[in-house]
């Protein structure tokens, strides 16, 4: 897979030891050192990504510097008769001279001949001194064909919740969630009450608006005074000349008859 010897110095160089009991997260430290004058990109992979958390699991090492990598084994039921076949691989390559904007793309586009790698075995040890035997020769022979995937980068505090000792925290979290639901329900009822109140006020405002419009219409019609007295007076003033004319005609006819 790689055509170059590993440029990084790994401590430990051949295996990672995890000391039990394994009822909680167990951490093994891995130190990576860059003795060269060039920047080196590194990535940590494993054949069991669901069983481990690695922080950091990738990065760039400046010349003449080192970094401590924490490899965290998640809690599990330890069986001393079961052979451990977990493997880790530290993969590296020289970083380009330009600024690396995306390490993911850098690894994706890297030619295979530029990659360097070192494989590490995992060994489980119990406090009494007995430890699980490393992988057999047959399993070592298949190391080259083992499937390595990047270890999931998780917060150790999140991983530790999987243990039974953390169950009270889960109960507390559930209780807190229940209180949050009650608060939300109370706020919802309060909001619904406010909406109902606003609807009532809106209805009152509509009724008031209709009443004001009616009053305005009444005021618009009423300015013309309905005083019937002037009209009859005008009629009285208009009628006398007509009466006089008629009376004069009648009087003329009577006088005419007498004269004839």
Curated annotation (Swiss-Prot):
<comment type="similarity">
    <text>Belongs to the VAMP-associated protein (VAP) (TC 9.B.17) family.</text>
</comment>
<feature type="coiled-coil region">
    <location>
        <begin position="172"/>
        <end position="216"/>
    </location>
</feature>
<dbReference type="GO" id="GO:0005789">
    <property type="term" value="C:endoplasmic reticulum membrane"/>
</dbReference>
<feature type="domain" description="MSP">
    <location>
        <begin position="7"/>
        <end position="125"/>
    </location>
</feature>
<feature type="topological domain" description="Cytoplasmic">
    <location>
        <begin position="1"/>
        <end position="238"/>
    </location>
</feature>
<dbReference type="GO" id="GO:0061817">
    <property type="term" value="P:endoplasmic reticulum-plasma membrane tethering"/>
</dbReference>
<keyword id="KW-0771">Synaptosome</keyword>
<comment type="function">
    <text>Required for neurotransmitter release. Interacts with VAMP.</text>
</comment>
<protein>
    <recommendedName>
        <fullName>Vesicle-associated membrane protein/synaptobrevin-binding protein</fullName>
    </recommendedName>
</protein>
<dbReference type="GO" id="GO:0043005">
    <property type="term" value="C:neuron projection"/>
</dbReference>
<dbReference type="GO" id="GO:0005886">
    <property type="term" value="C:plasma membrane"/>
</dbReference>
<keyword id="KW-0770">Synapse</keyword>
<dbReference type="InterPro" id="IPR008962">
    <property type="entry name" value="PapD-like_sf"/>
</dbReference>
<feature type="transmembrane region" description="Helical; Anchor for type IV membrane protein">
    <location>
        <begin position="239"/>
        <end position="259"/>
    </location>
</feature>
<dbReference type="GO" id="GO:0045202">
    <property type="term" value="C:synapse"/>
</dbReference>
<keyword id="KW-1133">Transmembrane helix</keyword>
<dbReference type="GO" id="GO:0033149">
    <property type="term" value="F:FFAT motif binding"/>
</dbReference>
<feature type="region of interest" description="Disordered">
    <location>
        <begin position="127"/>
        <end position="177"/>
    </location>
</feature>
<keyword id="KW-0472">Membrane</keyword>
<dbReference type="InterPro" id="IPR013783">
    <property type="entry name" value="Ig-like_fold"/>
</dbReference>
<keyword id="KW-0812">Transmembrane</keyword>
<dbReference type="Pfam" id="PF00635">
    <property type="entry name" value="Motile_Sperm"/>
</dbReference>
<dbReference type="InterPro" id="IPR000535">
    <property type="entry name" value="MSP_dom"/>
</dbReference>
<keyword id="KW-0175">Coiled coil</keyword>
<dbReference type="GO" id="GO:0090158">
    <property type="term" value="P:endoplasmic reticulum membrane organization"/>
</dbReference>
<dbReference type="InterPro" id="IPR016763">
    <property type="entry name" value="VAP"/>
</dbReference>
């Amino acid at each position: 897979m790689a055509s170059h010897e590993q440029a990084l110095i790994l401590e430990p160089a051949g295996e990672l030891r995890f000391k039990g009991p394994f009822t909680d997260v167990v951490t093994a430290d891995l130190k990576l050192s860059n003795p060269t004058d060039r920047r080196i990109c590194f990535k940590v992979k494993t054949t069991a990504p669901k069983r481990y958390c690695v922080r950091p699991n990738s990065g760039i090492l400046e010349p003449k510097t080192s970094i401590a990598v924490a490899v965290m084994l998640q809690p599990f039921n330890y069986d001393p008769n079961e052979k451990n076949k977990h493997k880790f691989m530290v993969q590296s390559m020289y970083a380009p001279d330009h600024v690396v904007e995306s390490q993911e793309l850098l690894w994706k586009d890297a030619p295979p001949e530029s990659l360097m790698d070192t494989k590490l075995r995992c060994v489980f040890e119990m406090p009494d001194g007995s430890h699980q035997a490393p992988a057999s020769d047959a399993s070592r022979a298949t190391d080259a064909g083992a499937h390595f995937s990047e270890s999931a980068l998780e917060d150790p505090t999140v991983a530790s919740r999987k243990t039974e000792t953390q169950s009270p925290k889960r109960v507390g979290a559930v209780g807190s969630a229940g209180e949050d639901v009650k608060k939300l329900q109370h706020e919802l009822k309060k909001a619904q009450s406010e909406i109902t109140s606003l609807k009532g006020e809106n209805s009152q405002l509509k009724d008031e608006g209709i009443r004001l419009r009616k009053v305005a219409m009444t005021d618009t019609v009423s300015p013309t005074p309905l005083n019937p007295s002037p009209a009859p007076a005008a009629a009285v003033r208009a009628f006398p000349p007509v009466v006089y004319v008629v009376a004069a005609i009648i009087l003329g006819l009577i006088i005419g008859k007498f004269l004839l």
